[in-house]
């Protein structure tokens, strides 16, 4: 008993309340009942035990949303609080411990009434008592702050209960409550009968389904290659207008050869006939060339099946290999006539088609049999190199830009150029072998030897070194093969590679300055931050990040202790110098060691560093010594001890260097023509198979389908040429690659690529899964018509589920876009705003070869986008983590210095172009003269003086 004669008792501050008595938004108009005093609770039935347990859990879950605080559940007149809440720990207040918080409850003389009731006087009096309790205020401030934060975060869901739930106050008011068929209270919003009927029908239809439909991402089993099968590649050379010449070639073959069946059966006789036809080309060019074209196409009139036809094609073209130079000379002569002459163009263009057909078939056979018959392949490669066929075709296509003619057959020339590049340089498998050999030649580790090992780029490692130096100035991190630090502040090359450490990030610079002075020997740690916001207004944002721009002056965890149990348990294998007084935290030292061991220096990076040093030497007016250039493959001789793979790799590099030197001035026109050819696909029309069921309608659409097919094949060849050149140029020298990438970018490739991707984005999935009509004509079908047995055995399977003919074109386009915009912020800014939507459409079909360029561009584009864009493209962002190899310290989503990247973007582009001009003029001065660059020895040749002469000044 206390002084007032009232007894005290301990009881829980919050008691469970029945769910039907709860009211929204904690504004109560009626009296509530506690759950333990409801009749159903006092006398529980067996069937309702589980329901009551669920209600108790639900009460606890709804406490925060419905403001079930202590103020809402104080007792009535006989239960008034006059005590103070004891000091509780943080865990107890958070509900992490099982202690029950209790207060003293004053009991009134009216103890006989067992029902708790809320009255307005009791609530007001209780609130007045709370104003005098300081401990209660502290708890309530914290609760209010938490509730305010939740309301700010969930503002859009503030009135969910008012929309979805029944007004619980109506129960206590005794008003009419809707009851469903089962006799239960219906808390749903009232609806009219028609709407309820439609809802019932939808529910019934859902119940009838055995399982809900689930949209799976369909996968396409396809791999990007520069050369697929011989059947596919040979058929892509022809169009419907070319088939009319087949009969003439067969007739001339029978006229030239007295025993055609023996030619088909006896290989020795066939070789002698081929030799006679080659020798007679100067006397009768047209007839001999058409007969050789029929031989190259496999003598299809004498074959009985497609497999036999393919076998004869391989045999006959290998017989033409020893005479390849004569065929190339005849082809060049005819091509020049089609380009320059004005007479007999119809005849000349037919001869150009047949001569180029022979070369195309020989190239395809050699690409396919590179591993099986290397001797014949090397003969063809050497013959093409001696005759400069690759350079001739490039300049031939360049001439078409200024003097376009139908007789030049530009579509066939583009396809032939693509096959020549693949043959002379190599396909994907040859590229991997060559890259491995070149890396070994320069003493570098090929990246694919350890694909599971994460690495870090030199630029990110340099940024990490600067961060460690800013925190621990006396600690010297290992350089790990990085170039020496030189003053580049006055050089234009400073914009090429800019490390961006966290200490110089604007977010870090905005952090507060450390509270203690940096000169303090051993300052105490800062006080713990206040978790409670006591002021009015919204809770301010607080950041507890460390300012990386200030040195760390606190003692290390392993400083001054000889016996460290952690180091004893971990085998570090670190040699410590006894006289070294610099001690840093163990985690920092371990991170420095891991990153230094994982540093990956690519061949392209070393090449860029070398040319950058030469560029800086020239800027300062120093003399250069270019006697032994490490990356000049033209002057590199074969070593007697070199392996076969290394010799082959050096030969490929020399062919690339020769091609680059000869065609440097032609790349601009080549890219222009190729992009113009690619843009022709923007006018294509597509027809679904379900719309073209009539055979007569299909025959009417066949000419249009042939045109669409020819445009798409030209798109594939044009994109393949650019992709192959970029790929091989980068392996030869990074600045060769950058020069071609600049030319492609300046030709507005980004707009062209985005337009083509947008054109095909809607039909892409259905096109891949063969839902659209394709032309029924093909090279093999046309050849089968010349032999009855062949025609009977030949069958076209048009019911295939997947048609991947168009996928290489998209893969090439995306890869070129990635190579042109990669690590170039200025070019990323030119990407259209809808590029993310296009990527999502091509992301619908699962295929890693299509995913990789999309995800790599997404990885570079994401930091520059806002939160809404990131949320809308979260599927692409997740794909980067799933399918792409990331670096050790790669915080690519939000860790970039956006303002710094954007401000330095233009400078990076200018510095790169200046370095490209220096590289080309330094190594390919003769080729640069065709572009207007050269030494000016006399002042009279100065550009300003020449302009003055033109103006008569």
From Swiss-Prot:
* Location of Phosphoserine modifications: 18, 81, 524, 527-528
Keywords from the named record: Cell cycle, Phosphoprotein
Bias class Acidic residues marks the residues at: 141-160
Can you name a GO cellular component term?
A: endoplasmic reticulum
Give the region (Disordered) as residue ranges.
104-160
Supply the SMART domains for this chain: DUF3402 (SM01293), N1221 (SM01292)
Q: Which GO terms describe its biological process?
A: cellular response to pheromone; cytoskeleton organization; mitotic intra-S DNA damage checkpoint signaling; positive regulation of macroautophagy; re-entry into mitotic cell cycle after pheromone arrest; regulation of cell cycle
Report the Pfam families cross-referenced here.
Answer: DUF3402, N1221
Question: Ranges of Basic and acidic residues compositional bias?
Answer: 114-134
Task performed by this protein: Participates in the control of the reentry into the cell cycle following pheromone treatment.
Assembly and oligomerization: Component of a complex at least composed of FAR3, FAR7, FAR8, FAR10, FAR11 and VPS64.
Miscellaneous field: Present with 1080 molecules/cell in log phase SD medium.
In Swiss-Prot or TrEMBL terms, this protein is called: Factor arrest protein 11
Q: What is the gene name?
A: FAR11
